[in-house]
Amino acid sequence: MSASSLLSWHPRTIRRVVAAKDTGSEVVEAVTNAGAGFVKFLGNKEGPHILAAEFIGTLLAGEMGLPILDWHVFEYDGFPEIRLHSGSLAKAGSAWSTRKVEGFVWSGDVPIWRL
C-alpha cells in the first residue's frame, strides 16, 4: 500500500476483541472504530522493542517499494481491558495496528517462492 493509503485508516479505539493470538508479540485480532485489524500492545511477552522493530521494518519496506499493509499507531488508554494470550493485561500506551485483509495463512510447508 502506498503512503497515501495509510492516511485513510486511523483506528483510535478497540470496540471488541476477536482473539488473542499465541505469537511472540501476542497480537490481538480486534474490531476497532475503523474496522477489523490486528493490534500489538505494550505489555506483550517480547517487550516494547518488538513494536519498534515492526515500525522500523514497515517504514524500510515502504521506502524500498515493497507492498505493506495499512497501519497506524494509536494511544491505547487501557480501556477496555485487554487480556493478551499469556494472561497478562495490555498496558496503556502506544499500540501498533494493522488493517485486516483477506488472504491465506502460509503454513511453511511449501517454499514461499512456489506460492
Task: Please state what every model-predicted region is.
Residues S2-V110, L115:
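Conserved ATP-binding subdomain of kinase catalytic cores across diverse folds
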